[in-house]
């Protein structure tokens, strides 16, 4: 793998390696992405994000890859980091990012503070990509001596398990 420049950022505890590929493109294999994301031998991050050239609609295209090298459709915290870079660079207070599935509207609401609209979340379990069959009734977590039960799955571009 050849050398390349990147930015490492974090948003609410998630960290990202962000590669600006608008002018100079590099091809990264799944193995390369896993190596970059590796916390012991690589840079270390939750996700790798590519910033790609502006599309015909004026939006900047971005790609997200989890640390296992799998591509996902969106990440809220990662989108906020990319939006902050681009809005600072372009000296604007709003920008639209495009992923392969959606448009993400981003707005600067203060110094180093970005708000995004990721669209309507999907709560349909059958439409959320999970790798195994899951019995929601038996899925409980214990945190600080408190049991969290009755989770919901939601997809906003990347599947999440949430508790209300």
Regions from the language model: what does each represent?
Residues 1-112, 161-164:
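A glycine-rich beta-to-alpha transition motif near the start of alpha/beta enzyme domains, typified by
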Residues 2, 91, 98-164:
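ATP-dependent small-molecule kinase catalytic core of the GHMP/sugar-kinase superfamily
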């Amino acid at each position: 793998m050849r050398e390349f420049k990147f930015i490492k950022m974090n948003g609410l505890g998630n960290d990202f390696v962000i590669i600006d590929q608008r002018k100079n493109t590099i091809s990264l294999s799944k193995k390369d992405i896993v190596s970059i994301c590796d916390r012991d031998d690589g840079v270390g991050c939750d996700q790798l994000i590519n910033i790609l050239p502006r599309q015909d609609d004026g939006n900047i295209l971005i790609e997200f890859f989890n640390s296992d090298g799998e591509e996902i459709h969106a990440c809220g915290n990662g989108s906020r980091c990319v939006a902050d870079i681009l809005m600072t660079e372009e000296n604007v207070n709003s920008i639209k990012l495009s992923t392969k599935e959606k448009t993400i509207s981003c707005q600067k609401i203060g110094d180093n503070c970005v708000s995004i609209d990721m669209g309507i979340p999907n709560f349909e379990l059958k439409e959320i990509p999970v790798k195994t069959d899951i019995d929601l009734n038996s899925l409980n977590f214990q945190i600080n001596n408190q049991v969290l039960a009755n989770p919901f799955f939601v997809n906003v571009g990347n599947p999440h398990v949430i508790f209300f």
